[in-house]
């Protein structure tokens, strides 16, 4: 969670709904992008009345707390880069804290900016992995993104057209078939077992959702992976396109997502060079333009607002982001490393999980 979300309506609604849930053994909130102790205190205050099954309070991890930062520095000194501050690292820290406390077998993750949140969403997300009779290790959520218009631009106009165009250029590749099988591959909502949490490496940036799916593909059997509809419709904080600045907004998000897809495909033997990138981008643009025409028809049929020009601008921005991600890969195939999985961290630093738990708790005490 970002501190700015404490001021919005979404998080308060989520807390109210979660306070009525009676099956949670643990609630962990990972706060990133907040260096001030008073901001950390404000986030904790939102959860002050929440109680888990055994009466324990919610845990808020202050990612910028001095002791947590010292531990991250210790990882860097060991050659284990935890990445920069962001959604991926915040999620990774929360997973580490859950492993350290040894209370959970299944962990559900979702964002803190969901508008109109209902506790049924969490129940549906947890059930496939929590029910031992179902034998699933990983569940991915999906939902509709419609109000008076179609939302989910990155999924509609980038992710799905890119996967389809890559299949047309490269032919059937198991990883592409797998990624395309998800109804909403960029959904932030998923649940998984702690065994997978130990094994998965994840990106520190906006490539988190794609990176997690790729790691689950690598570390789990397909028959133990499922997807579940969480709600009929879903709304959250909308980001600006930022067409002229790849460092912000959806533009940056698409650069990170494209980088994650390219690097994961390369790890399965796909070669990326300048000529292939040009072909891939051309195929993507054509497929995305066809998608715009289809969405225009959907909007007309259902009486929705549809700005075709803004959709075309989005595709142009996303194609620029794809080119940037591809050229970055050609220049530096390794790129920014993924955060090491928890199995490797524990192997290198056997006491790290206990130290993380202690750091989280002491940072919270000192900030009080």
Q: Where are the model-predicted features located?
A:
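Short beta-strand-to-loop acidic/aromatic patch adjacent to the donor-nucleotide binding site
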Residues: 101-117
